[in-house]
């Protein structure tokens, strides 16, 4: 059996999942990558090639016939070629009593004195014990392979990160990487599919099996579909033979579920205060009917600003960046949609922030202290981040912060919904809101923005930004639809 460094990545990305690794090993087809995922793959190759261009003359092993790449790599190392691109290593060993062939393909081998540095190029901005463990394990496996084949350790292991910096990765002799490969081997040797709980943030993060796994979980009424049942709790319940919401409700009262310990990090933790809510979610998932807990607490105003941001995560941009600040007043005196967009030049981020402050100030001038209604904490967090980044000279951002109304906790305190997630996209569909765009979503919008940034065609850029603006405008309309639905409860 062949085990590769890519198997470790499959185990971790987009989120940790042993079932994905198993299905890939079984040859089960995945859905096509999203537009965003395809763009990120392209950007990753561009990032890698740009770094390669800084390294001088190199030998490209990927141009060699596949069955000759391992021997060509070793010969090139022996000949002390300055830079070896896309090297390939293979080494037969025994892991957990099984004979396996371990394969690794580091991006760069860079001669430094008499020894080689092993370096991989990644878009990730941070690589350490707390960020992207799989990258460190990948490099450690390359280091172990190099040592077995060459006979001496590599000079160092490094990552060329998304910031352009080069970070060192500690080498432990390959112990951690080989231990992880033992986990990989155990999954690949399974004769039946391993149990994996589904989860909204886990499975909707870009996994190619989400449609397959979600449909199967719904068909078997898996307990992991119950809101607030985290991955550790789902695994614990499943191992105890409790696999459905019905079994959960019939097996536990609040106190007993509260006392149940489930895996949590390296140890265990009681379910605790979440037990009551979990049982409520289980009950409504069985009945399919929502449950009113308390009056909906929304402050009375004539008008409300629906407020939504579109941003790029730090792994895809030099800084975590909001590229669109969307606002629209609804109520007795509605406004047109307002989209404050960051510029495409070097100072575009600041331009977008200033445009938002100007637009928000105009709203306050016309409407007074009007609530800015949003969904979840993204807006509050990022306003605070931008105040630290660029300041708030006239106090407009501080005023927005004072007037923020997060509709998510308002909803959760008032109503238990028979849904697997309180994501706005899920709740808006539940209340009957319909969108007009065939394609939409945060990842889709990021893909459009990246394409708009990369193109020199002004017409194409404007068309893509127009689609993003339309998506954001419908996000605001969806928030208002949920808001109105809540007020009628």
PLM feature spans:
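Metal-dependent nuclease catalytic cores that hydrolyze phosphodiester bonds in DNA/RNA
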Residues: 1-114
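Cys/His-rich metal-chelating microdomains
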Residues: 20, 210, 378
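Short, amphipathic alpha-helical segments that act as regulatory/interfacial helices
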Residues: 48, 52, 56, 143, ...
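Short linear loop/turn motifs
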Residues: 67-71, 250-254, 264, 439-451
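Mg2+/Mn2+-dependent nuclease catalytic core
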Residues: 82-182, 321-322, 326, 331, ...
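Structural signature of nuclease core domains in nucleic-acid processing machines
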Residues: 112, 116-118, 122-124, 297-479, ...
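Metal-dependent nuclease catalytic regions and adjoining charged, substrate-binding loops involved
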Residues: 126-133, 145-218, 363-366, 386-402, ...
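C-terminal extensions
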Residues: 213-329, 338-339, 349
